[in-house]
């Protein structure tokens, strides 16, 4: 995400070795300082994604493992298939953009596509068609998927920040017999 609000964090899902992410990854559609734009969904290789994040933005990544029952796993797979039906493939531009330090570089979406074996999609319908940092954001998509496993924690107002989601996962990890079974820092 290129918005000023990406500083508050970001939530991705990893399922079967593929990272699943949602955000405003098309700079040509950004408005309101990156707060609004086309909703882009992508799937990419987990290990290559971790390497890209560490190299590009020196991010600290927190990974949580969730133990899914066969029923939960089936529900997650159904939700992923349902979401994918609401999209069309999207190829990010190969044009370089000016970075904060004045240099030219490929967009984040282009790097995801070409450096992490990424598949990118734009939503053509549903609430995810337009990304909005305060409501239709990365946490909403993650919770739409992971909520199928019984972790539906969105606030009644419909907004939850990435840090709140992380705090929930930390609390669950500390509980005995929780479905959150592991935590890793990358």
Please place each PLM-identified region on the residue numbering.
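Non-catalytic ligand/cofactor/substrate-binding and regulatory segments of enzyme domains
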Residues: 1-133, 170-186
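Active-site nucleophilic cysteine motif
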Residues: 7-10, 128-163
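C-terminal or late-domain output modules
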Residues: 147-186
């Amino acid at each position: 995400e290129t918005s000023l609000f990406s500083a508050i964090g970001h939530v991705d899902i990893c399922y079967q070795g593929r990272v699943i992410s949602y955000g405003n990854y098309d700079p040509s559609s950004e408005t309101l300082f990156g707060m609004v734009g086309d909703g882009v969904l992508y799937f990419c290789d987990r290990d290559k994604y971790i390497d890209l994040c560490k190299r590009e933005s020196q991010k600290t990544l927190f990974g949580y493992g969730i133990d899914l029952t066969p029923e939960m796993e089936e529900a997650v797979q159904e939700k992923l298939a349902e979401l994918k039906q609401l999209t069309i493939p999207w190829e990010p531009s190969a044009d370089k953009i000016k970075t904060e330090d004045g240099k030219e570089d490929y967009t984040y979406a282009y790097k995801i596509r070409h450096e992490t074996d990424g598949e990118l999609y734009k939503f053509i319908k549903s609430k995810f068609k337009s990304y909005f940092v305060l409501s239709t954001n990365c946490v909403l998509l993650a919770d739409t998927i992971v909520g199928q496993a019984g972790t539906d924690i969105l606030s009644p107002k419909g907004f939850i920040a990435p840090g709140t989601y992380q705090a929930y996962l930390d609390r669950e990890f500390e509980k005995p017999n929780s479905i959150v079974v592991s935590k890793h820092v990358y």
